[in-house]
């Protein structure tokens, strides 16, 4: 039986460095942070969104409202992942109408998760603008015309490979690894 090959791409320090860079890019692009809110896509996008908001606050001194969104029932493949999908809660404790929403996810792959998140987001209001921030962009794998505004790093992979983001909040460690069958 063959073992999967696990190739480390980023460690915890690397993830922190990337989040600092992304926070600075957001601050530079948005001189007025007042209309800005950050919403993470369950599960790891939620933790990254909180970390990103905390990093912006550390750099700029301005707290950014954060929320999280569950896209399970908005996915176009949920029947393929099981007839009893596990639905998590959505917590958006502020209006998003006329706000600039930065949607945060761990990995941008086909674009389908982002599409589902955009669909879910419209149930909560009509933002002035939505921008996408991802820790990892698996470039060249898109099935939909979706592109991130803020990218931590680009990782070139084969379709059969898996990019896994591990975060201390859910996995006990911070790392990005590529698993090759």
From Swiss-Prot:
EC top class named in words: transferase
Transmembrane segments: none
BP-aspect Gene Ontology terms: regulation of DNA-templated transcription
Sequence motif PRPP-binding, residues: 101-113
Keyword terms of this UniProt record: Glycosyltransferase, Transcription, Transcription regulation, Transferase
Disulfide bonds: none
Enzyme Commission designation: 2.4.2.9
Reaction(s) this enzyme catalyzes, per UniProt: UMP + diphosphate = 5-phospho-alpha-D-ribose 1-diphosphate + uracil
Lineage top rank: taxon: Bacteria
Single Gene Ontology MF annotation: uracil phosphoribosyltransferase activity
Its job: Regulates the transcription of the pyrimidine nucleotide (pyr) operon in response to exogenous pyrimidines. Also displays a weak uracil phosphoribosyltransferase activity which is not physiologically significant.
Entry's family note: Belongs to the purine/pyrimidine phosphoribosyltransferase family. PyrR subfamily.
Annotated PANTHER family: BIFUNCTIONAL PROTEIN PYRR
Protein name as annotated: Bifunctional protein PyrR
Organism: Desulfosudis oleivorans (strain DSM 6200 / JCM 39069 / Hxd3)
Classification lineage: Bacteria, Pseudomonadati, Thermodesulfobacteriota, Desulfobacteria, Desulfobacterales
